[in-house]
Amino acid sequence: MFTYNSRGELVGDQLRPGGRFGYQYDNIGNRKEAFEFGSTTDYETDELNRYAGIVRNGGEAFTPQYDADGNQTLVKTSTGIWEVTYNAENRPVKFESEDGGTTVECAYDSMGRRFEKKVTVGGTTGFHARYLYRDYLQVAECDLTGETPEVVRSYIWDPSEPEATRVLSMTRWEANGTQEKEHLYCMDDAMKNVTSLFGEARGRRALYEYRPYGGLITSEGNMGEENGFRFSSEYMDGELGLVYHSVHRYQFV
């Protein structure tokens, strides 16, 4: 059950017994406090309405950093602290972990769509993908780690909602995209969040539950990690703990 204040801001959510969420804001909508599963996070803002300090359960404060354009260049997510580099169009092109061991690089086309992502851990490329689009909907993913690109996944979207739509199914491919490995079908809620994946013969393959602003509470099943489309039917970058929005860039959860 969601509760809102007079300005339409979310102030409470009773997900389940013991699963209460609460939020407080200042007069212009900046979050001041978050209460989630018994944990309290306090936020401090600067004169430009940017978060200047974040303290969890009274511990050490994390201080975000920004460039001259207001892009956040030092971020803290569920996977750690990342230093972010942006291109001239203010799109994030490189994420480097605090210890320098992991680098995530992104490339964009002339329409601002991310068409490539490369993850390097300890100097070794562990993930390298190219994304294919129909307008702003990702319809296929190619693996670039081998000598030749191979189609590994394709997606079907709800045609009744051409813009703010939801993913309906995923096909996994093998033999360089010439043979279907399996079809997986998505179940979603009223907010377009993918809540589960089902196979044709093997039952439920993934189950997800979310916090009010997109953080994962539950991720179960042998396809729980491989499936990228989760909160709001947007792509989850598991390495970064961030949701990639094709139009709105990254949402910090």
Identify the role of each PLM range.
Residues M1, R20-F21, S39-T41, E60-F62, ...:
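Short loop/turn microsegments at loop-to-beta-strand junctions
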Residues M1-G12, G19, Q24-A34, T45-G53, ...:
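A short glycine-rich beta-turn/N-cap micro-motif
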Residues R16-G18, E36-G38, N57-G59, T77-T79, ...:
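Glycine-centered tight beta-turn/hairpin loop motif at sheet-sheet or coil-to-beta transitions
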Residues E33, F37, T41-T45, E174-V247:
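A motif-centric feature for acidic-aromatic and gly/ser/thr-rich catalytic loops and repeats
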Residues G59, K76, E96-E98, T120, ...:
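Asp/Glu-centered strand-loop micro-motifs enriched in Gly/Pro and often flanked by an aromatic residue
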Residues N71, G80, T120-G122, R172-A175, ...:
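Short beta-turn/strand-loop junction motif enriched in small, turn-promoting residues
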Residues T125, L132, T148-P149, P159-E163, ...:
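Extracellular/periplasmic catalytic domains that process cell-envelope and extracellular macromolecules
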Residues Y136, C142-Y155:
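A contiguous, low-structure linker/loop signature
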